[in-house]
Amino acid sequence: MKKFLKYVLRPHWKLIIIILILSGFQTYFQLEIIDLFNSALNCVKQENMDLILNIGETMLVYTMLSMICMLIISVIATNVSANCAYETRRNIFHILMNLPSEEVGKFKITGLMSRTARGVYTEQGFIEMLLKNVLLIPFVITGITILILFIHIHFALIFVAANALIFIILFFKMKKVVELYFKAKKTYGRINSLFLERITEVKNNIKHSNKEDFKDACDDSYDKNIKYQLNQYYIAPILFLILDGIILILMAMISLGYSICIDTVNIVDSVVIIQYLVYFVTTLTFVPKLIYKFPKAYATSVRIEEVLVLEDKIDTKIKNKKINFKKFEFKNRKSRNSRKISNIDRRETRKKFGLLLSNYRFKFIFSFILLTISTLCIVYAPKVVGNIVNLFTNGNNVVEHEVIFTNILLLAILYIAGYLLQAYSNRIMIFIAEKITYNLRIQMYDKLKNSKIINEKSESNILSRINNDLVNVRDFIMVHASEIFAQLLSITLVLILIWTTDWRLSIIYFIAVPIYAICFYHFDANSKKSYEVHQELLGNLMGFKRDCLENHELIRLKNQQENVESDFKTINFEIKNKYTSSRYHSGLMSPLATFLTNLRNIIVYICGIYLLMNGEIQLGTLLTIIIYGKLLTTPIKKLTASLTSVQTSYSSVKRVFEVIENYDEE
């Protein structure tokens, strides 16, 4: 992967430096907002409301600057990832069209097709995540460590140690997961080859004879994918459990300090440290998706490198230069110019997909029950943290110490139970998704004979539905369905608990959530059409490339490399444009979410400090409200990211059902 990333990102090093600089500024502005809140808290004893309002104005300025940084990073990252994908597809095609036929013959056609379409698409998404999210983490860790170091050196060391532990777990665990994914990935090649044979048989009215082989290939793929998934589904919950464990250690340190009369961490400082930790956790919302995508991106990069390293073997000699050939044409050329998206009714598609999922409704219900309990545990935890802080500020008698340690124990139980139940819910969804994928593969294979699509689309366009679209459907069931449920549930529960904590401050959140929804719906509607067209174009690209590979020797004989590369460039450019146009809309969601979140937090800070100054609420209550605000931000950000996957998944579901349901009656 290192070679591939170096190959595709080197031409964009100047833009990457800009992203790094902006990531540093973004982190500074976000942490400065929290630091300003600390300054505002210290003004409570002085009862200087004018100074607090001035601090609020400064926070607003930093919020605007942070949003601008995020927006620029999003635009640059989208352009860089789109250009990397465009150049990679172009280079792969150029190499293959100019390689000697014996070199091309060493690869399976289906494998070369998938590298250009789904393979490059996978790398594109990974590169975008790398630029937008991963590059931000070193700045956040460094910034928080330095700020905590000024407050308490021992706790700064604990924070660094926890991050080192997370890195070690990721490094060694992901190494094994990648190896298992390579084994699972190999099974896709056999499935694609057998499915392509089936398409050819149906198109040419040849008697079908390979169903058992196809079923065996699906069985093998199911077994290896289950083994791969079971080795990585629990990694993200464990990492977040470690991060939340840092809060437990902080509470224990403060409690210990009060018990033995040692000034460990000032209560106000501890509130600020908790906010730093909560902000750090919110920046890691992408980690589960990164863990899921990394093995795919790693394996795909290796497969792409296998083609790119063949550039030295390109045969540049022009054959038959004196012969005047007409321009080479393909029988399936018309398929690539198709722009019309299937008119299958959206409601009907959702209904069919719902019926498919209903066969596993009891497992779904059980999984969602576990997820509900898990969410309840995690969402209730901030209330316990607030109670502990209130107990610290109430006095130092023995009874309160016992209650404090009881609350710390309760907090530990909530975190452990919450993340363990979340992991087991993920395990159930893995089996459901893999089984549905297995059944859909068999159905597509069986019903292909009578499908109308067999005469309407190219062979490779049909193949992309089992190679690309079915994988998207599986990912939606396995990851995004439960994610969306958990996110919506978290938002609902957080709003309820905020209301029960303090109804006055909760009004701010109840006003903010509909604004989030309206903005995100607008961006979602604008990006939907581009996603559907993008998926259709990927299918057409696979069809065009298959035509070229099957006629590779003839293309070279007639010196048509430049002509087919020109046609490929046209399709490739359209794919790039559709990707960037859809990502520009969805890419605005995260900066907008951050802006609205910071604006909401500033209002909560000012109003909360005013109530604290007048003795109407306690410090622990304000901290609980603030943590709930961060906890509300996390599912909202995840929900915005999930919208992208929902659009891709929805268009993929339509394309799968076009094969299964759109058939001629015998």
Where are the predicted features?
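Short, membrane-interfacial amphipathic segments enriched in basic
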Residues: 1-2, 102, 106, 333-351, ...
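Primarily residues marking transmembrane-helix entry/exit sites
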Residues: 12-17, 52, 56, 72, ...
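An intracellular "coupling" helix at the cytosolic face of ABC transporter transmembrane type-1 domains
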Residues: 13, 101-102, 118-127, 131, ...
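Juxtamembrane helix-loop junctions of ABC transporter transmembrane domains
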Residues: 29-38, 42, 62-105, 109, ...
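A hydrophobic transmembrane-helix motif
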Residues: 32-38, 65-70, 131-174, 230-278, ...
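Cytosolic ends of transmembrane helices, especially the final helix of ABC transmembrane type-1 domains
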Residues: 210, 234, 280-307, 430, ...
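Primarily ABC-family ATPase nucleotide-binding module
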Residues: 308-346, 660-666
